[in-house]
């Protein structure tokens, strides 16, 4: 009925207006960041044994996709000339969400760790305004070989007022993983690179549903990572207007037809095509559904590939059941990543922290990160060994499919105000029940 339609659009508008409110609040909070006092003490960087002790809050622990890689990285650094005099003092926080909340808290009041690992959220400006992270511009200027590892876009993304504060350690891309067996069971032939349109994609979802298969993984807890990737794709592939919107940093007006249409489609996905525990559900649970063959498709990046081989996470042989495709309309999320920052104040600590960032982004370790954690090299001039492509066919597919994307776009966790991101994930259940 017209009345029902009217109410439906009012609910959509409500979600979008809440996003706008979130944006305005974000502006206020970001503005306040510049007045926060620097509470860090200029403590000596050396312990009694003459070692430089670097404090690090590490979320790459436990079952995190990059836990093994970061353990290797910290240990290997201590065996180098620059790191042989360095010790790490770790505080472990096991989820990115809790880590990001902690770092934001320390930016506003407290001491940041000496190395500030990136948690995926774009907090560079917030941290730079606080005066608690080091300007790294001169270190890059003094080491041209190191600077050449990064594109201008990567460094601009990690800059504030023309100064570089973050060193990006990988490139973020995402696309769709699908379960070949479930597609076969539903009588669907997967497209070579992706569905040409969202209509074709939803036709496949309907076929899966008809066979009792849940089409897609979605979530709402911990900022709703999977739901955000679908949402970014819906907007980012909606012609030039949508693509421009998803490639813009810190947009302030969400009352556009492309955002409204994407919101309506996301609502349909939450209501019709996902698991019953998606609302309030965390990423880990939704990933497990995919590993267990309970869901046909999940959007994510290459860092998930090692999990397909891990019998701690997925059944034996699961890797061979997984295929990849671009998002409908030949879309792929591709953004520069927020980089690691230096929160140290003592000169010895700063020197050691910068040396660690150089080690972390060396060509050798970018390949190691790809191999061990599925992290895409940040440097475009790095040659991926054929042996790695041969031993990891899915990763080879990922490296190949990137060139076939017609639309590349950002995702909201990287490009939107933090408060908008928070409001968005909080409103997902209301949108679904709407």
Regions found by a protein language model. Name each.
Residues 119-175, 202, 229-232, 319-323, ...:
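Hinge/lid segment of periplasmic solute-binding proteins
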Residues 160-169, 174, 184, 199-251, ...:
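Extracytoplasmic/periplasmic solute-binding protein
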Residues 11-19, 32-125, 129-130, 141-145, ...:
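Conserved N-terminal structural module of periplasmic/extracytoplasmic solute-binding proteins
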Residues 1-9:
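Short, Lys/Arg-enriched N-terminal segments with co-localized hydrophobic residues
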Residues 153, 320-325, 370-426, 430:
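Long, aromatic- and glycine/proline-rich binding clefts that accommodate carbohydrate-like moieties
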Residues 27-31:
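C-terminal motif of bacterial Sec signal peptides marking the signal peptidase cleavage site
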């Amino acid at each position: 009925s017209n009345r029902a339609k009217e109410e439906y659009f009012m609910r959509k508008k409500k979600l979008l207006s809440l996003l706008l409110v979130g944006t305005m609040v974000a502006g206020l909070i970001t503005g306040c960041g510049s007045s926060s006092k620097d509470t860090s003490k200029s403590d000596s960087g050396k312990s009694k044994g003459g070692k430089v002790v670097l404090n690090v809050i590490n979320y790459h622990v436990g079952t995190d996709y990059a836990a093994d890689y970061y353990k290797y990285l910290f240990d290997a650094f201590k065996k180098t000339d620059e790191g042989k005099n360095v010790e790490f003092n770790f505080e472990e926080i096991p989820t990115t969400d809790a880590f990001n909340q902690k770092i934001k808290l320390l930016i506003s009041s407290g001491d940041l760790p000496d190395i500030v690992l990136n948690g995926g959220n774009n907090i560079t400006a917030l941290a730079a305004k606080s005066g608690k992270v080091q300007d790294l511009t001169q270190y890059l200027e003094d080491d041209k070989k190191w600077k050449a590892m990064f594109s201008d876009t990567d460094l601009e993304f990690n800059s504030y007022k023309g100064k570089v504060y973050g060193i990006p350690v990988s490139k973020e891309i995402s696309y769709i993983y699908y379960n070949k067996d479930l597609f076969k069971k539903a009588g669907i032939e997967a497209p070579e690179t992706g569905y040409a349109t969202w209509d074709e994609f939803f036709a496949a979802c309907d076929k899966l549903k008809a066979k009792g298969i849940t089409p897609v993984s979605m979530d709402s807890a911990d900022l709703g990572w999977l739901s955000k990737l679908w949402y970014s794709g819906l907007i980012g592939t909606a012609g030039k207007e949508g693509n421009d919107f998803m490639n813009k940093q810190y947009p302030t007006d969400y009352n556009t037809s492309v955002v409204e249409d994407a919101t309506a489609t996301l609502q349909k996905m939450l209501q019709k095509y996902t698991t019953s525990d998606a609302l309030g559900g965390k990423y880990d649970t939704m990933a497990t559904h995919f590993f267990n063959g309970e869901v046909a498709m999940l959007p994510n990046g290459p860092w998930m590939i090692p999990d397909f081989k891990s019998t701690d996470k997925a059944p034996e042989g699961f890797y061979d059941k997984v295929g990849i495709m671009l998002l409908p309309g030949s879309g792929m999320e591709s953004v520069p990543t927020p980089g690691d920052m230096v929160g140290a104040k003592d000169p010895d600590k700063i020197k050691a922290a910068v040396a660690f960032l150089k080690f972390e982004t060396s060509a050798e370790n970018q390949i190691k990160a790809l191999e061990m954690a599925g992290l895409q090299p940040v440097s475009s001039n790095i040659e991926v060994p054929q042996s790695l492509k041969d031993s990891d066919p899915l990763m080879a597919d990922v490296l190949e499919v990137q060139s076939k994307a017609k639309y590349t776009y950002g995702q909201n966790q990287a490009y939107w105000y933090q408060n908008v991101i928070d409001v968005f994930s909080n409103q997902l259940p209301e949108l679904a029940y709407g």
